[in-house]
């Protein structure tokens, strides 16, 4: 089930994000609690919850059309959770009137393959990451 994230969810969101091996931002000092709080306070961060536990989340920034995060606990991959969270994030951005939806991810990762399969296209690079747009 998808629901809006709450501040009390932040420790679990950080845990999920930090557990993804292919994540360049695994260093906890690079993504702060304040970053998460902004998304909780400004609708755009959603969690997938099962049996009382969070297994994935997405975050979208309506200020600039950016998908800031999409992470699923590895034990729950391959079940459509990422796709559902991704669609929710895109809906938030489109509803906010964002003319450009974009994100960055490292090349050669599962995330890159996911975004390509979703029909997003690479439009450049930024700080060693691919820039995808829809």
Language model regions located:
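Acetyl-CoA-dependent GNAT
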Residues: 4-75, 86-87, 92
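A generic structural signal for beta-strand entry/edge sites
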Residues: 64, 100, 127-129
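Active-site acidic-Proline motif in GNAT/NAT acetyltransferases
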Residues: 73-79, 107
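Conserved active-site alpha-helix within GNAT-family acetyltransferase domains
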Residues: 83, 107-124, 128-130
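Conserved GNAT acetyl-CoA-binding A-motif
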Residues: 93-106
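Short beta-strand-to-coil "C-cap" segments at the C-terminal boundary of structured domains/repeats
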Residues: 132-134
């Amino acid at each position: 089930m998808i629901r809006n994230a709450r501040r009390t969810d932040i420790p679990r969101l950080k845990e999920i994000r930090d557990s993804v091996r292919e994540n360049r931002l695994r260093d906890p000092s690079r993504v702060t609690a304040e970053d998460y709080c902004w998304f909780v306070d400004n609708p755009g961060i959603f969690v997938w919850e099962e049996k009382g536990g969070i297994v994935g989340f997405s975050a979208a920034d309506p200020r600039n059309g950016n998908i800031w995060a999409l992470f699923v606990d590895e034990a729950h991959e391959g079940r459509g959770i990422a796709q559902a969270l991704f669609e929710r994030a895109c809906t938030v951005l489109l509803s906010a009137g964002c003319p450009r939806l974009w994100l960055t991810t490292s090349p050669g990762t599962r995330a890159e393959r996911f975004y390509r399969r979703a029909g997003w296209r690479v439009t450049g690079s930024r700080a060693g990451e691919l820039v995808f747009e829809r």
